[in-house]
From Swiss-Prot:
Example GO molecular function: 3-methyl-2-oxobutanoate dehydrogenase (ferredoxin) activity
Enzyme class: oxidoreductase
Complex and partners: Heterotetramer of one alpha, one beta, one delta and one gamma chain.
Gene: porG
Key word Oxidoreductase present: yes
Taxonomic superkingdom: Archaea
Annotated keywords: Oxidoreductase
Known EC number: 1.2.7.1, 1.2.7.7
Pfam families for the chain: POR (PF01558)
Protein name per the record: Pyruvate/ketoisovalerate oxidoreductases common subunit gamma
Amino acid sequence: MIEIRFHGRGGQGAVTAANILAEAAFIEGKYVQAFPFFGVERRGAPVTAFTRIDEKPIRIKTQIYEPDVVVVLDPSLLETVDVTAGLKEDGIVIVNTEKSKEEVLEKLKRKPKKLALVDATTIALETLGLPITNTAILGAVAKATGLVKIESVETAIKDTFSGELGEKNAKAAREAFEKTQIFEV
């Protein structure tokens, strides 16, 4: 079983990202779970969401405390939240940032085996006209993890958002997939 933990802020779409990733894996015939955890429920407050993906039915119902993958939608969280808490030794961290690998690693309390960086904010602004990075970051997740194909992510996005909005969000995911930089740490 692969466990993914998303870190974002209220209004950024972390919960939607967790759900879309689960749908993309479901499209590929995998068993999935996706669920949020809210602390203080207000726009801008830190939000955590979770996705589990497996080849067999998932019976566990707890939060994810030892993720295989951590996805950070808002780079300012690197300053205030230990996003790598419990990260497995061979874990992957995916960050929406324009900063360098060195700058990001300096902020992480635990070093991942693999670090993936993409400027999802710029991609979202250029593609959607809004700094909502949830769909763009899923392109980075597909590239960095290989858990799902980018085509499945695009299909799941279009299933979630109809018409032109779906097309634009799928385009953002594809662009992030192509622009994600991956580093072995």
